[in-house]
């Protein structure tokens, strides 16, 4: 008996917008896509911003898109998750933060807040520091000290003064907090085992060692005079009139490290939390019985409390198909192979039982605008053989071209990329329909829909435009207002499988 496969076909970087100028999707000759769009139920999905777990207005990307598609739910990235917690009041109820604050109140000790002092949003966000200051004031914590790591990398190289001034205004507004040390991220956020750098930051915070200044802005001005900008500012100590440090980290203090990205937070965290630390001599005043809080899970090696614990993605589409004994195929060329495997499975490398994978090599060319068809024809040929062999109940396929060629910001090659994919799409969908199967044709984010700026310059970034979804089954109706997290529930619906509770997305098929 022949299988009737349900195929999820992802046209990477293929979104829709009305304006045709600079729009390779609109300008391409794509008879197959147009035929399916006209003949079958269709709608559009939001693939950016909070709909995929990113900050509102932020463009989607392939990793985030495939995570959301496979998970069948919104997968919140750390920055967004914390922003939402602040907005909805959950941040102020966080048990780990409250425990740290109770610890210092019970011991009559100090709370130290350290992290990257910018709104770059890559490693940290200064608004999270402000939320902690506000919470400390609300909880009646009196001694709150800030150890600011200066950025200059994810933001401009001489932006520290504006962040320090803004922080000083917040300190005044909340009536709590003092800046105790400043250090360029080169020292405090090293990740390359340059322990001499980390040691300088540590000794400033614990021993009050390093250049001293009465005023944080004076520290920055002095560095700038010597041609040393934010990222490289030497770990420096802010002192009172009598020359003593505003604060050093001592026994029974609490630390909240408000960076959310782990890689550059691990070394300095290990310096404070590891009993077996051997990288440099921490000296006689190394603080004991610290209550150390990481904003997110940094590493197994960091012995601290975690404020926002990782969310495990259980019951992704691949796992559910496997649990029901269905055979599934994941297929893509090199550029998007991790996306249909690792990211589609919620960050899991191993295959599920009953899952097969086909990797087609991407062409070896300097840039893909030189070969806009990439390996789409080879992917298609390999897939047509598998459809013919009647092996799979479910297929997940990615065509990389609209995204990878779209990144060139060149219109003509991107039009050719879309046309090549359309030709392949026609062959695959018609083969699936011939078997009595169903195709879900969609995309993960925009790109090829906007490859020129209004003044004709290359536009190489992703877009925030809606992506299409077509379900090649007549007699059904699709609802509007969907998100990428609704695709897995739709696929399960078409396969007649129950949706697990972890999948909070909803089938697009109107019942």
UniProtKB/Swiss-Prot annotation:
The EC number(s) this enzyme carries: 5.4.2.12
Gene3D superfamilies noted in UniProt: Alkaline Phosphatase, subunit A, BPG-independent phosphoglycerate mutase, domain B
pH dependence: Very sensitive to pH. The enzyme activity rises 25-fold between pH 6 and 8.
GO biological processes: glucose catabolic process; glycolytic process; regulation of sporulation; sporulation resulting in formation of a cellular spore
Entry note: cofactor: Binds 2 manganese ions per subunit.
Catalytic class of the enzyme: isomerase
Binding-site residues, Mn(2+) 1: 403, 407, 462
One Pfam family recorded for the sequence: iPGM_N
Binding site for Mn(2+) 2: 12, 62, 444-445
Binding site for substrate: 123, 153-154, 185, 191, 261-264, 336
GO terms for MF: manganese ion binding; phosphoglycerate mutase activity
Family indicated by similarity: Belongs to the BPG-independent phosphoglycerate mutase family.
Note: The pH sensitivity is physiologically relevant, since it allows for the regulation of iPGM activity during different parts of the developmental cycle.
Protein name: 2,3-bisphosphoglycerate-independent phosphoglycerate mutase
């Amino acid at each position: 008996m022949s299988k009737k496969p349900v195929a999820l076909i992802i046209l990477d970087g293929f979104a829709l917008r009305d304006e045709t100028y600079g729009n390779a999707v609109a300008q391409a000759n794509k008879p197959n896509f147009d035929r399916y769009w006209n003949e079958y139920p269709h709608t559009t999905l939001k693939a950016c911003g909070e709909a995929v777990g990113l900050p509102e207005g932020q463009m989607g990307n392939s990793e985030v898109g495939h995570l959301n598609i496979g998970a069948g739910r919104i997968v919140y990235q750390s920055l967004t998750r914390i922003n939402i917690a602040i907005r909805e009041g959950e941040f102020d109820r966080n048990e780990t933060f409250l425990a740290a604050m109770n610890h210092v109140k019970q011991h009559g000790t100090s709370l130290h807040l350290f992290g990257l002092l910018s709104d770059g949003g890559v490693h940290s966000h200064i608004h999270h520091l402000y939320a902690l200051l506000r919470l400390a004031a609300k909880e009646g914590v009196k001694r709150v000290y800030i150890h600011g790591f200066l950025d200059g990398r994810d933001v401009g190289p001489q932006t520290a003064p504006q962040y320090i001034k803004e922080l000083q205004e917040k300190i005044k507004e909340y009536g709590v907090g003092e800046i105790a040390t400043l250090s360029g991220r080169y020292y405090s956020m090293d990740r390359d085992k340059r322990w001499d750098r980390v040691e300088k930051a540590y000794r400033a915070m614990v021993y009050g060692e390093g250049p001293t200044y009465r005023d944080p802005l004076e520290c920055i001005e002095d560095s700038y005079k010597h041609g040393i900008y934010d990222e490289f500012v030497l770990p420096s100590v802010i002192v009172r009139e009598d020359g003593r440090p505003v604060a050093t980290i001592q026994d029974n203090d609490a630390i909240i490290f408000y960076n959310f990205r782990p890689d550059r937070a691990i070394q300095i965290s290990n310096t404070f939390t590891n009993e077996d630390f051997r990288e440099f001599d921490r000296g006689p005043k190394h603080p004991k019985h610290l209550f150390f809080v990481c904003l997110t899970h940094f590493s197994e090696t960091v012995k601290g409390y975690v404020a926002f614990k990782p969310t495990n993605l259980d019951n992704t589409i691949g796992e559910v198909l496997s649990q029901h004994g269905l055979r599934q195929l994941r297929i893509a060329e090199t550029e998007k192979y991790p996306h249909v495997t690792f990211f589609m499975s919620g960050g899991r490398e191993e295959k599920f039982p009953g899952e097969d994978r086909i990797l087609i090599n991407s062409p070896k060319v300097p840039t893909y605008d030189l070969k806009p068809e990439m390996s789409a024809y080879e992917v298609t040929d390999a897939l047509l053989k598998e459809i013919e062999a009647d092996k799979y109940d479910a297929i997940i396929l990615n065509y990389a071209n609209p995204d990878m060629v779209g990144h060139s910001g060149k219109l003509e090659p991107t039009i050719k990329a879309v046309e090549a994919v359309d030709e392949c799409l026609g062959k695959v969908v018609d083969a699936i329909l011939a078997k009595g199967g169903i195709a879900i044709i969609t995309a993960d984010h925009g790109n090829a829909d906007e490859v020129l700026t209004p003044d004709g310059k290359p536009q190489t970034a992703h877009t925030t435009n809606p992506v299409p979804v077509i379900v090649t089954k007549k007699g059904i109706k699709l609802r509007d207002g969907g998100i990428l997290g609704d695709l897995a529930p739709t696929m399960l619906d078409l396969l007649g499988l129950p949706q697990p509770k972890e999948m909070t997305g909803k089938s697009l098929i109107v019942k």
